Amino acid sequence: MRISLKLEPQSGILKIPIHYNHILQAFIYRSLDRALADWLHEEGYRYEKRRFKLFTFSRLRSKRRSFDRSSGTLSLESPIFLKIGSYETQILESLAIHLVKWGEARLNRTVCRFASIEVEMRVIPKGPLLVRAISPITVYRTLYGTDGKRKTYYFTPWEKEFQELIFDNLKRKAISIYGDENKLPPLDNAY
């Protein structure tokens, strides 16, 4: 399930650092029921030593935007669009209720009015599925060099490990939801 937000900054323009994911993540946590936000942030869905939040969000989209290299900021003209998705409908329900109640939010010290909040219902696929990512997918592995120092290797989509690691990550997340690998559907030839 997904929520699509249409935001209108009071000034008509939202200025935000180029690396703004933490700002959106904080906005999402602040917009949830406090107990749910605390549980999600501190606990989440567990798989071995990992904790998954099981929500995602797109980049901010705007028809007109500019980048100021000297300050490292993006200027996004109204309207601005954001999609937030989650497997867990409770997260999106809590988010939607609070956003409708408040009617506006502050992003990077700019007040933004919610012009619309739309719920996109979950589509249950039948057969093969082509997925289009609306934000970049980063796949990496931490390795150790001959000197013993940790190094992060980022895979490209053209490397075999890229899709294998994505699939393994999805499988871990599914197990964190269902609690047991035996409850998952058969995954033969899934990629």
Report the location of each language-model feature.
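RNA-interacting cores
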Residues: M1-Y191
